[in-house]
Amino acid sequence: MSIFDYFRAKRAPTSASLAKERLQIIVAHERNKRSLQQPDYLPQMREEIIAVIRKYIPIDSSQVSVNVDNSENCSVLELNITLPD
């Protein structure tokens, strides 16, 4: 930044830059909204996990719960299985 930059008039934002900024806000909002929901692949993953477990142990599908917890830096896949005695 030079001393002459202080004397130059500030340019008004162009319509393209305004549109870009608005689009970035919309995309960020949609990503945030989508991250709060469960992922699309979770039901299929749950069924595949149940199928693998059933190869070794007879279980009911109601005994398996799969959750995804999203935090700021990472996502955690939580799998709880109630095993028969």
UniProtKB/Swiss-Prot annotation:
Annotated InterPro entries: MinE, MinE_sf
Top-level taxon of the source organism: Bacteria
Protein known as: Cell division topological specificity factor
NCBIfam families associated with the record: minE, PRK00296.1
Task performed by this protein: Prevents the cell division inhibition by proteins MinC and MinD at internal division sites while permitting inhibition at polar sites. This ensures cell division at the proper site by restricting the formation of a division septum at the midpoint of the long axis of the cell.
Entry's family note: Belongs to the MinE family.
Pfam family name, one: MinE
GO BP, sorted A to Z: cell division; regulation of division septum assembly
Keywords assigned by UniProt, alphabetized: Cell cycle, Cell division
Organism per entry: Cellvibrio japonicus (strain Ueda107)
